């Protein structure tokens, strides 16, 4: 009963439950069915009475009353007349809310083309009629006639006629022999008369017959649109409008400002324009005005409607009174300020506040301090309810008064209300899910929010004036989710890499580090203590210090929980820390009996979390935070100017390097080296000098010194302590303070040759200061730009991955990826253990020696397994991956593996796609904000030698070496590798060695760790001969293909190959060097080709004609790019390039087949390379290579599939096509990881795999079979598999396709959900396409559901959806049973009853 009464005042329509949304083109009948009346006048409201004009844009008769339950003239007021239509003013008495829902319409006097279907590319009307957009516009805007019915005349259908031609045709054939129309009517006729089935059939025939690719593409486009119309039930002529809908007036409001003026929505202006022109056109037609006037008016009407729908899409932008373009209906949806992103995906919420944050070290981890004033305001409704319940007030008004007066009982009640009611804290920018966490509020005085210091890392917050927002979860479910999922105590691990994120930083680290220092010769050294009591006593009486070496007894428990103890060599400081460790058999004293750097603290917390669980970890973290602060305060570590030590040897090192650079200068002057080489060498020398000075400085800082008087160890250097502990500062910064600042980079990324020799302690000279401003400014400018770029990258990633949700436990996939350790320049940068931890094993992992099973197939690999795997030295493991998961919607839990933020197998409903996107995007922003801290100091990344990273035996793979005239071994092979094997013959390291490297070892040699294996010149690439003989030049003509450049400063000449194609005389030269024997015959190479070496532009000749050379001698050199500094700047665009799957600028060319290289006939500036296959069944493949590119293959070389013909970054599409999905995945994962690794950012591979999975969702049809697709169509992979399964069952021919790689933007726009795509980018295009195809959005992803305002299908929402589905299925079963037993009437009644319940 109560419910009914309440509903009288606010009749709420039952919420519709729906499962999908469809979009299609509105027919005129549909528009009329929405409309409540025609708008005939352009007036809005009467400016004196402020009442809407009748039949105007705000008419109350059409749209509904202005005030609730009150007609316009005031005859009927109040509820009792509800639903009556006033006979005087014609207004229905109802809620004024209907003015937000009721639409009107305008009957157009002439049809008008809908600009979206006309101008949104590709033009739908154009494609359908097979006419160009220009021609259609000519007809629409009354320039040309179009023949719609040629009759028996010589005119063709769709032929355009100008005014004169039309007149001539009328004279020639007579007016009734043919039909030619002009304007939108003409297009309407053409569209209405189309027989789509027939056209589709014809197009299919044409497609089968055509041979040219271009024609095929065109026909396919047209066929696709025709099919879309046929399938969706849209009619083509609906793209021409005869009726324009008018949106409800409250969505385009007119607001009175003070001073009698009005602020209005632009739409009203645009509608007014349409109505004015339409009425004028009606009048002109009635008056039978001359055709030319009517035509002009029709054209203006078309333009007015165009501007209303999409202003500025065609012609001039229509501007308002203040020269500002008017916002049309399309602009309301588009962009960041449009409906989708402003109001549907991002809403402002109530019950929120924001304030500055201050640190709250005495809080527990799950608490935050909330100012009383804020809490009182935020929790008002709860307080009113509690005041009422406790009988302090009987009405809300009284309660309000009590709260306003801030009576004592109010504060008591506030305490009760707040207890155990979590609030959400958020710091913008929210880059990952840890940017919003829940805390229990404690009330504090003052106006600032107190934040626990340990969560600062997660929020990326500091206390220099940052602000944070507070939100109150209201419903019980919201509070529950906040507590169970978002509480800060539940977010101990970082979702990107599974490492703890609740880690002490800065002061706390310094305090803990200070505690753990060991010092020699302290008082009380060697004492033994039985328990902490004795130790405390000794400390307080200064018998021992915190750093004394002592023996102490550490008490813990064994596996059964019985107390055990053990004596350790340790220090009192470490014993104090050990006291805080949870008592657990797996947490030995050893983890805190070491120097407590930030890394070790992080490891310790991780260890505690893995073995003792979450609760213990949280308590432990809080305790070590307190301890850290206390001791940082007691230690009083600070530093002064004298703590920055300048090494004595600095002057000597600088002098030596200056001497070196002068020598290089001299060599350059003597012409021994080129300008580029000199630059590289100078830069190198200074780089090494800087490193050397830094080493000396660090050695001085680390040095342990003793006080000659007391004999005790002097206090460690404070700066060193801060840096070494990881509290603040890096070696790089210390170098700039006390060593030398080193080389600086120009804004272009090049390094300035003259370094900054001074450091900040000595002070910079004016010139040095000026040189250093470059880098510093570039850093600041970059930061601003890159923050935006990074944010955009994250947005694209989220958009492409938003529907990757864990939807089942196991998909049963039998394919996966092979994981191997990542080796870079001989260093293992990611061990196999790190890579497979928390993943599911695909095959059983066996011990290589004993053969026993370490991990069974289908089990998740845990920490304990990783230890065994690493010890066993296993080098490759097959694991399940999201990339190869076969789940239909989403990913399965087995393929994903461990939920990194919890350390347990991932739960169903986890939105792994969004987590992946945030994990990749968040460090992007972090890094971009971090560039300028280096102050532009250059870091050169180039190595010139290779050292053994292990002891072992050398094995050469693809061995191809010769001894040159100096007796050195020289590598002649393109893909030779040096392997180092351990005693058991297992590969420990693999190094690629480049062509032309000098080898110091040979097959079977043993090497020690750190021994030089090979070296090469990193700045030039050699061209070497592999036969002994005499050099002769071919086509090396002075002035044409070779120039002798004399260096201005030195007068020494060197001979360089120049671009010979620039002159007509030199166009067919092929500059080369040939090696002949004494008789003058050209020698043969081992692979059968002539010993002719083609030279590319910029090669520097190293020998004279006629010189005698031995195998392995360098005959020419190619300069390489000079070393540019690497910085995430190169990084962020690189990541974007990889995710967008763009072809890199100078991309590598990859061999598609195995075979032999042959040179074909060259083009003008391309070189033709043909690969002759080893297998006769395959066609040879040819490649065209730009001639200027450094090219290293010779005629007759053997090449394998997947090898590079031309070096560079390979295009991901090529890798996919040639080597397949797994190779592509490992390439993308490694390349992206490389960029982040340079910055020291850890991201788990699985995140990148999830994104790559989303990029590989489509296949391109190659064989259509009976699928009904056309070759070249892009289809969802899973869709094709399902259709094929069905076809095979029916005994028909299945289709096949190749996987295509789509960039993330493209993939987001191609999601099955048009709502999600429209809210991402190119809104108009997406909606136009969806409407033509009559697309259905099944609301599978997260974004669509947020937009329509439902629970997202992840997490809680995912489970409720599942439960709802099961329930509906069961209900249907029950009703079926009822139907069988008791007849349909009862069952139907039950159905109605159920739907009503569901609606309530």
Swiss-Prot record:
What's an example GO cellular component term for this entry? DNA-directed RNA polymerase complex
Q: What is its EC number?
A: 2.7.7.6
Q: Where does Mg(2+) bind?
A: 462, 464, 466
Q: Which UniProt keywords apply?
A: DNA-directed RNA polymerase, Magnesium, Metal-binding, Nucleotidyltransferase, Transcription, Transferase, Zinc
Its required cofactor(s), as named, are: Mg(2+); Zn(2+)
On the tree of life, the source organism's domain of life is Bacteria
- Give the Pfam families listed for this entry: RNA_pol_Rpb1_1, RNA_pol_Rpb1_2, RNA_pol_Rpb1_3, RNA_pol_Rpb1_4, RNA_pol_Rpb1_5
Chain residues that bind Zn(2+) 1: 71, 73, 86, 89
Give the Gene Ontology MF terms in alphabetical order.
DNA binding; DNA-directed RNA polymerase activity; magnesium ion binding; zinc ion binding
- Where Zn(2+) 2 binds, per the record, is at 811, 885, 892, 895
Co-factor remark: Binds 1 Mg(2+) ion per subunit.
What InterPro entries is this protein classified in? Answer: DNA-dir_RpoC_beta_prime (IPR045867), DNA-dir_RpoC_beta_prime_bact (IPR012754), RNA_pol_asu (IPR000722), RNA_pol_N (IPR006592), RNA_pol_Rpb1_1 (IPR007080), RNA_pol_Rpb1_3 (IPR007066), RNA_pol_Rpb1_3_sf (IPR042102), RNA_pol_Rpb1_4 (IPR007083)
Function, please? DNA-dependent RNA polymerase catalyzes the transcription of DNA into RNA using the four ribonucleoside triphosphates as substrates.
Query: Per the similarity annotation, which family is this?
Result: Belongs to the RNA polymerase beta' chain family.
* Assembly description: The RNAP catalytic core consists of 2 alpha, 1 beta, 1 beta' and 1 omega subunit. When a sigma factor is associated with the core the holoenzyme is formed, which can initiate transcription.
Q: What is this protein called?
A: DNA-directed RNA polymerase subunit beta'
Query: What gene name is given for the protein in this entry?
Result: rpoC
């Amino acid at each position: 009963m109560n419910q009914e009464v309440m509903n009288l005042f606010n009749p709420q329509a039952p919420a519709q439950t729906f499962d999908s949304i469809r979009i299609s083109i509105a027919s005129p009948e549909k528009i009329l069915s929405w409309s409540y009346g025609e708008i005939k006048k352009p007036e809005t409201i009467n400016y004196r009475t402020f009442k809407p004009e009748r039949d105007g844009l705000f008419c109350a008769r059409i749209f509904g009353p202005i005030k609730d339950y009150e007609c316009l003239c005031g005859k009927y007021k109040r509820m009792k007349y509800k639903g009556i239509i006033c006979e005087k003013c014609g207004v229905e008495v109802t809620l004024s809310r209907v003015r937000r829902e009721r639409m009107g319409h305008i009957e157009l006097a002439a049809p008008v083309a809908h600009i979206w279907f006309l101008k949104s590319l590709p033009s739908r009307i154009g494609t359908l009629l097979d006419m160009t957009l220009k021609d259609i516009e000519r007809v629409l805007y009354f320039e040309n006639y179009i023949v719609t019915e040629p009759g028996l005349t010589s005119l063709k259908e769709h032929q355009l006629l100008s005014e004169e031609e039309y007149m001539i045709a009328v004279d020639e054939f007579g007016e009734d022999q043919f039909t030619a129309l002009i304007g939108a009517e003409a297009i309407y006729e053409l569209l209405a008369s189309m027989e789509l089935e027939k056209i589709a059939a014809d197009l299919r025939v044409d497609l089968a017959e055509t041979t040219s690719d271009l024609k095929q593409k065109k026909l396919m486009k047209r066929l696709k649109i025709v099919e879309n119309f046929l399938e969706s039930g849209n009619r083509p002529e609906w793209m021409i409008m005869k009726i324009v809908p008018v949106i409800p007036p409250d969505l385009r409001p007119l607001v009175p400002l003070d001073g009698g003026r009005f602020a209005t929505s632009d739409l009203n202006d645009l509608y007014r324009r349409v109505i004015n022109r339409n009425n004028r056109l009606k009048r002109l037609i009635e008056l039978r005005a001359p055709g030319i006037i009517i035509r002009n008016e029709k054209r203006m009407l078309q333009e007015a409607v165009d501007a209303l729908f999409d202003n500025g899409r065609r012609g001039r932008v229509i501007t308002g009174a203040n020269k500002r373009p008017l916002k049309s209906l399309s602009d309301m949806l588009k962009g960041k300020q449009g409906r989708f992103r402003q109001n549907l995906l991002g809403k402002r919420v109530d019950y929120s506040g924001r304030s500055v944050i201050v640190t709250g070290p005495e809080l527990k981890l799950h608490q935050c301090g909330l100012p009383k004033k804020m809490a009182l305001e935020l929790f008002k409704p709860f307080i009113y309810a509690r005041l009422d319940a406790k009988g302090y007030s009987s009405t809300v008004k009284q309660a309000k008064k009590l709260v306003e007066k801030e009576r004592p009982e109010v504060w008591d009640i506030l305490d009760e209300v707040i207890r155990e009611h979590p609030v959400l804290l958020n710091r913008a920018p929210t880059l990952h899910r840890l940017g919003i966490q829940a805390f229990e509020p404690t009330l504090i005085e003052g106006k600032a929010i107190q934040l626990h210091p340990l969560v600062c890392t997660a929020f990326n917050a500091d206390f220099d004036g940052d602000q944070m927002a507070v939100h109150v979860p209201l419903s019980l479910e919201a509070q529950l989710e906040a507590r169970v999922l978002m509480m800060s105590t539940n977010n101990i691990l970082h979702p990107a890499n599974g490492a703890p994120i609740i880690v002490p930083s800065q002061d706390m680290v310094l305090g803990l580090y200070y505690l753990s220092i060991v010092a020699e010769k302290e008082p009380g050294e060697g004492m033994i203590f039985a328990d902490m009591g004795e130790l405390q006593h000794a400390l307080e009486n200064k018998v021992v210090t915190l750093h004394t070496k002592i023996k102490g007894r550490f008490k813990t428990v064994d596996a059964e929980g019985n107390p055990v103890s053990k004596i350790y060599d340790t220090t009192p400081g470490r014993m104090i820390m050990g006291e805080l460790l949870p008592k657990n058999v797996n947490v030995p004293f050893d983890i805190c009996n070491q120097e407590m750097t930030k890394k070790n603290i992080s490891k310790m917390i991780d260890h505690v979390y893995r073995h003792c669980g979450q609760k213990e970890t949280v308590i432990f973290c809080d305790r070590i935070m307190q301890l850290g602060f206390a001791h940082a305060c007691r230690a009083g570590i600070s530093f002064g100017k004298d703590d920055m030590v300048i090494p004595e040897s600095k002057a000597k090192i600088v002098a030596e390097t200056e001497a070196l650079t002068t020598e290089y200068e001299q060599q350059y002057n003597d012409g021994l080296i080129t300008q580029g080489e000199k630059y590289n060498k100078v830069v190198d020398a200074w780089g090494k000098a800087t490193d050397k000075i830094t080493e000396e400085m660090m050695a001085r800082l680390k040095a342990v010194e003793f006080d000659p008087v007391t004999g005790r160890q002097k206090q460690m250097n404070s700066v060193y302590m801060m840096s070494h502990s990881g509290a603040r500062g890096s070696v790089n910064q210390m170098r700039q303070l006390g060593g030398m600042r080193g080389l600086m980079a120009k804004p272009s990324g090049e390094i300035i040759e003259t370094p900054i020799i001074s450091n900040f302690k000595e002070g910079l000279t004016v010139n040095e200061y000026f040189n250093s401003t470059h880098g510093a400014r570039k850093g600041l400018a970059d930061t601003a730009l890159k923050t935006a770029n990074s944010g955009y990258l994250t947005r694209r990633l989220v958009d492409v991955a938003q529907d990757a949700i864990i939807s089942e436990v196991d998909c049963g996939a039998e394919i996966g990826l092979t994981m191997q350790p990542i080796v870079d320049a001989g260093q293992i940068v990611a061990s196999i253990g790190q890579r497979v931890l928390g993943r599911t094993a695909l095959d059983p992992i066996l011990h290589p020696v004993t053969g026993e099973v370490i991990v069974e197939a289908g089990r998740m690999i845990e920490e304990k397994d990783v230890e065994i795997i690493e010890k066993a030295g296993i080098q490759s493991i097959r694991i399940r991956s999201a990339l190869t998961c076969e789940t239909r919607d989403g990913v399965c839990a087995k393929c994903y593996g461990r939920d990194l933020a919890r350390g347990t197998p991932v739960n169903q409903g986890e939105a792994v796609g969004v987590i992946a996107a945030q994990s990749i995007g968040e460090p992007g922003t972090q890094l971009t904000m971090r560039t300028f801290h280096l102050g532009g100091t250059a870091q050169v990344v180039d190595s010139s030698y290779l050292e053994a990273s292990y002891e072992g035996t050398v094995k050469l793979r693809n061995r191809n070496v010769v001894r040159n005239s100096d007796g050195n071994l020289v590598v002649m092979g393109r893909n030779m590798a040096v392997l180092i094997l351990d005693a058991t013959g297992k590969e420990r390291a693999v190094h690629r060695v480049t062509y032309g490297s000098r080898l110091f070892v040979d097959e079977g040699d043993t090497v020690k760790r750190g021994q030089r294996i090979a070296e090469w010149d990193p700045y030039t690439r050699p061209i070497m001969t592999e036969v002994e003989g005499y050099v002769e030049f071919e086509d090396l003509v002075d002035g044409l293909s070779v120039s002798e450049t004399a260096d201005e400063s030195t007068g020494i000449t060197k001979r360089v190959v120049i671009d010979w194609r620039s002159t007509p005389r030199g166009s067919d030269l092929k500059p080369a060097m040939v090696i002949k024997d004494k008789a003058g015959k050209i020698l043969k190479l081992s692979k059968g080709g002539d010993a002719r070496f083609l030279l590319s532009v910029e090669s520097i000749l190293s020998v004279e004609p006629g010189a005698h050379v031995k195998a392995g001698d360098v005959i020419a050199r190619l300069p390489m790019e000079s070393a540019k500094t690497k910085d995430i700047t190169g990084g962020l665009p690189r990541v974007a390039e990889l995710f967008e799957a763009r072809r890199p600028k100078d991309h590598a060319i990859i061999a598609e087949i195995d075979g032999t290289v042959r040179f074909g006939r060259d083009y003008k500036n391309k070189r033709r390379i043909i690969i002759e296959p080893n297998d006769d069944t395959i066609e040879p493949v040819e490649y065209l290579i730009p001639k200027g590119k450094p090219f290293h293959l010779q005629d007759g070389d053997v090449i394998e599939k997947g090898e590079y013909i031309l070096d560079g970054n390979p295009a991901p599409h090529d890798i996919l096509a040639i080597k397949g999905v797994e190779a592509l995945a490992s390439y993308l994962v490694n390349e992206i990881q490389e960029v982040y690794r340079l910055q020291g950012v850890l991201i788990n591979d699985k995140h990148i795999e999830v994104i790559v999975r989303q990029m590989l969702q489509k296949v391109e049809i190659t064989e259509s079979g009976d699928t009904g697709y056309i070759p070249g169509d892009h289809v969802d992979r899973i869709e094709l598999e399902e259709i094929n399964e069905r076809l095979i069952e029916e005994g028909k021919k299945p289709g096949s396709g190749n996987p295509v790689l789509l960039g993330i933007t493209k993939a987001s726009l191609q999601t099955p959900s048009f709502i999600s795509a429209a809210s991402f980018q190119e809104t108009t295009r997406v909606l136009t396409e969806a409407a033509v195809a009559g697309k259905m959005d099944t609301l599978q992803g997260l974004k669509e559901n947020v937009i329509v305002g439902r629970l997202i299908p992840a997490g809680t929402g995912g489970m409720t959806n599942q439960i709802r589905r099961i329930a509906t299925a069961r209900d249907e079963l029950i009703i079926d049973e009822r139907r069988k037993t008791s007849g349909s009437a009862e069952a139907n009644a039950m159905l109605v009853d159920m739907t009503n319940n569901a609606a309530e």
